[in-house]
Amino acid sequence: MSNHHAVEKTQAELAELFAKDLTTGVGRSVKHDSAAKHVSGEAQYIDDRLEFPNQLHVYARLSDRAHAKIISIDTKPCYAFEGVRIAITHEDVPGLKDIGPLLPGDPLLAIDDVQFVGQPVLAVAAKDLETARKAAMAAIIEYEDLEPVLDVVEALRKRHFVLDSHTHQRGDSAGALATAEHRIQGTLHIGGQEHFYLETQISSVMPTEDGGMIVYCSTQNPTEVQKLVAEVLDVSMNKIVVDMRRMGGGFGGKETQAASPACLCAVVAHLTGQPTKMRLPRVEDMLMTGKRHPFYVEYDVGFDSTGRLHGIALELAGNCGCSPDLSASIVDRAMFHADNSYYLGDATINGHRCKTNTASNTAYRGFGGPQGMVAIEEVMDAIARHLGLDPLAVRKANYYGKTERNVTHYYQTVEHNMLEEMTAELEESSQYFERREAIRRYNANSPILKKGLALTPVKFGISFTASFLNQAGALIHVYTDGSIHLNHGGTEMGQGLNTKVAQVVAEVFQVEMDRVQITATNTDKVPNTSPTAASSGADLNGKAAQNAAEIIKKRLIEFAARQYKVSEEDVEFHNGHVRIRDHILTFEALIQQAYFAQVSLSSTGFYKTPKIFYDRSQARGRPFYYYAFGAACCEVIVDTLTGEYKMLRTDILHDVGASLNPAIDIGQVEGGFIQGMGWLTMEELVWNAKGKLMTNGPASYKIPAVADMPLDLRVKLVENRKNPEDTVFHSKAVGEPPFMLGIASWCAIKDAVASLGDYKHQPKIDAPATPERVLWGCEQMRQLKAAKPAEAEAELASL
């Protein structure tokens, strides 16, 4: 209960300790709680766990057809392999056969047909993974091919949708376009992106008594896995416990996609009574799982001679793949963020959810927002080229105002707008205008190598657009030695969530972080959790943990006031000690006294985000609690004979409110920018004519490496600007907003290519801007520069 050998300190010594500040509370750059384990290889992931006795390994046989009717499945050849325990099809699933997260469309195993190359048709469980693989490939599947739809434009033209389209409308965009001083139209393809988490999808399931299961799953959404496992087994959720200590990366790819391996393992474990594990090899993982939604964009925009928008019509066609998954909300968010930082004037934005015979696309960092922002940044660049203006001048001319021109096309007022101040600060710190002139001079004297520069803003809304998800729970126990045990509903995927939440609890109790122990996210400790997504992890779970800690702290204050016969205002916690008027004692001493006085030292906490609502039928509301702002300035050099390029320098200024942990936040900004840059420059997904993903491994799908980093990367957080909303210690979310900073790299490449045409034409460079696309853009600029004005106009119109 206490250490009887400890030497008691005098009141003077305790007063000296009380006066000192915490070193690990909120606002300090505390290292990630698992940092040492990550770099030493000691961090335990699911595949590092000791295997259970008699554990089976599961391998799924995937469809090799994009669209086909299943005529027959013969699993008898599977049993010819020694060590095979069972082969299952959809007929063996005891409960619900569809694991669609919100709407049906994702059968656990194919039922009557297959909808994409990579869809699981059957699964084999055996003594080891290789035996299971060989046996699964021996099964005989007979198909009757059907005509697939593989192209998003074809799907749009055929109105081949997974869900109905949705419209945001403000004013009379058609009238504004018809009367605008200038008007341009264009199209843009925006590619998808593979999550490429280091740890592929994995689950391990242990059957328990009474039909229960313990599910160890690498998931961002433990409650959804719990729910779906219960449904496929036809049992109640209280029979299923999901345990999630850490993921080896997620980025949205483990929000819904983690359910399939967990459910397959659960079915096998149910049928055999044996523990079961399924780990996807990289190729199978990339074939089975959805990506970031590719988008096709059509724009029609009217503006004046300063570049200010008068009206805009946008068609945003998201390639959703073969089922709804989360596409309703993802395309909605693309529409919400199709303004980025700009007042659009009269606007019509149509969002289409196109169905193609590819894997069902899913959540990815930004959740549709980046695609909407890329569309409007293409428009800003196109206006600048049309008018012969600096693209930054056009962007600033369209910024949201503070007291006017400050309402979005979905009728949310942009409050606490920091765009102008942040842009001005970044202009100065990055020496934008001096470098712009220097680059013009360089390009005028360099026929082959061309430099580009772009400064782009970010305004990103924080909250789940599905309002009911904006809630979180936490559970805190304080033990009699003064140590603290914390569980919350969020999941740790390397982003530092556990560290931040522990800092919050340490700050409330005014103890150092080493007193706070966070263990695995577990559905039997914190139930009904929302996914760790939408940048909400710290906002929701930090606030829930703060609530739980404050409940216990209030009990302690009330007890101390009674015990020492003082007012509650006389009780103060600071640096691991408690001052009760003139008397000081250690935190653990107060805890022991409270325990003997039968004060509860445990509490749940709960939080729900206030103020938000969205009426989808009217397409208006306040879907976001607040906005996070940022800006990035990128400089690039392009070899116009090969299309190759190098990022020379990037300056970033980002708004995180009052940072909970500046070191972790800067790491998130750096990583977000690089991942966004990778999406828009090198991460190209390629399917063949039969719908098979060809870029299905690290040999063919390239993510940024060390050599792709800007040679000079400067990141700064906005200082002395707390979040005006009542968030956890007035911080702001930092998971997704920095991703959109990468748009500056794409715009800088286009700026360099545009210099070949004297900045008079907008290069046709779809995203990602691979060297091949950049080379074609360079050739286009050369042809336009050589053409007569009428010919150039005709050429542009044909693009």
Where are these regions (language model features)?
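Flexible, low-hydrophobicity surface segments
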Residues: 1-165, 183-186, 271
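C-terminal catalytic domains of large/alpha subunits in multi-subunit enzymes
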Residues: 5-7, 90-91, 234-239, 269-276, ...
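Glycine-rich loop/linker segments at domain edges
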Residues: 28, 33-41, 166-203, 294-379, ...
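Extended active-site and interfacial segments that coordinate phosphate-rich ligands
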Residues: 33-37, 58, 137-144, 220, ...
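Short beta-strand elements
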Residues: 43, 202-207, 296-305, 311-316, ...
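Phosphate/diphosphate-binding loops
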Residues: 127, 274-320, 543-572, 576
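Helix-loop-helix junctions that connect adjacent transmembrane helices in secondary transporters/permeases
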Residues: 153-233, 399-483, 694-708, 712-716
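Thiamine diphosphate
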Residues: 248-273, 277-279, 497-505
